[in-house]
Amino acid sequence: MAFEIAFNPSGVIERAKTILNDYGAKFFTEDKLWVWLLDGQREIALQVPEATSVTAPLELAPGVTQAIPATSHCLIDVPRNVTGEAIRPAARALFDEMRPGWATEGGALIVKHFIYDPERDKKTFEVWPPAAAGAAVECISSAMPDDSSMASNLFAVDSRHANGLTDYVVFRALNKLTGNPQFLTHAKNHFDLFMYSCGKSADAGLLLSQREAA
C-alpha cells in the first residue's frame, strides 16, 4: 500500500531507509543517518552558498576590514547601506592603483563600495570609504547549518535540495560498505546525483577510494 513521506528532514531519513531497505536499523542507526543528513546540509552550504543565504543588518567596525556574521562561512553580497544607499562591488587592485591611500581615508557613515576576495579570506571583506562608528549595511551571507535544524525538524537549506540530501545520506551509508564492489558502484551513483543536484559535476573516485570508518 502506498504511503506519503513528509517533506521535511524526517522525510529524508525515511526515504533513505527505503532505498537502503533498512527499516529495522540492522545496518545503520537512525542517529547515524541524522548525522549524515546534517553533514549533507553543510556540504550543500559549501557547494551552493545561496541555499543557506541569510539577509540581516550588519553593524560595521570602524575602518576598512569587516567580518561576516559568526554563523556564516562566506559572503554573498552587500547590496546597500541600512539607510538605503546602494553599495557596489569593487576590485582591490583598482583602488590600490587609483587611490593608494584609500584604506587610510577618514571614516564615513555611508559605504559606497565593498571588496571581497574569498580566495584570500572567506570570513572578511573591506569597505570604502572606511566605516565610521555607527555605520551599518545590509549583509547577505551563507549560514553554516548547525544541530538546531535537526532538533526542529526543519531544513537548514532550501527545501528544493531534499532529494539531493536523500542521495547524500544513502551515499554515506553505502560508503561504509564499499568492501563490496556493488555497494561501491551504488555509493558513487548516489554521490554523483547529490553533486548534480548542487549544479556540480562529480568524480567520486577519491571520496570512495577508502571505506568510511564506522
Residue ranges and their predicted role:
Residues 1-214:
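Glycine-enriched, solvent-exposed interface loops adjoining structured elements
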